[in-house]
């Protein structure tokens, strides 16, 4: 039965939002205890979770489903511009290709094992946005568009947009089950 299949998507979205909020909290409040590898993984995971939500509400391939869910939950895409940023989503989905290109370019630097060159390499990773990179001093996450132009994603915007989505889902849930 298709009745209220929308809430299957709602559960999925709620789980993504739950993990987004946990990651933002960990990145923000526990950053002194996070080792660099975990910091990178958390940053990349945050981008992936945001992309998952965007794919539900703003899918090009499943436009009808996306439009139905947006209408069903009364979600204004204008209120979630950070989440549905297609440039960020597209680049994040092709992350492996960017890393392949980068690793080819950087293999010479890594083979020399010059610490100054390695530091420059780390700087390039951060400035070119080759990874999801959280800048916690400025409360933001960086990614890049397909032309490698930096995209700045404010963590506070992500929190506000995900709270808005949760609110819209809860309103609909209470209308159906008062």
What positions do the PLM features span?
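Amphipathic alpha-helical interface segments
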Residues: 1-81, 111-178
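Short, surface-exposed loop/helix-turn segments at secondary-structure junctions
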Residues: 103-113
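Surface-exposed beta-strand edges and their flanking turn/coil or helix-capping segments
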Residues: 98, 107, 166-168
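Histidine-centered, metal-coordinating catalytic motifs and their short helical/loop contexts
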Residues: 79-104
């Amino acid at each position: 039965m298709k009745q209220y299949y929308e809430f299957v998507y709602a559960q999925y979205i709620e789980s993504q939002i739950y993990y987004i909020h946990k990651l933002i909290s960990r990145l923000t409040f526990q950053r002194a205890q996070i080792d660099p590898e975990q910091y990178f993984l958390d940053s990349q995971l945050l981008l992936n979770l945001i992309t998952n939500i965007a794919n539900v509400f703003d899918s090009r391939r499943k436009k009808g489903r996306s439009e139905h869910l947006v209408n069903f939950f009364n979600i204004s895409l204008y209120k979630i511009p950070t989440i549905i940023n297609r440039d960020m989503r597209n680049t994040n989905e092709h992350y492996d290709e960017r890393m392949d290109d980068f690793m080819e370019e950087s293999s010479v630097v890594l083979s020399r094992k010059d610490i100054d060159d390695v530091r420059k390499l780390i700087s390039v990773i951060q400035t070119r946005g080759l990874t999801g990179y959280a800048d916690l001093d400025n409360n933001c996450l960086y990614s890049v568009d397909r032309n490698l132009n930096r995209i700045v994603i404010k963590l506070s915007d992500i929190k506000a947009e995900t709270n808005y989505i949760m609110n819209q889902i809860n309103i609909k849930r209470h209308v159906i089950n008062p």
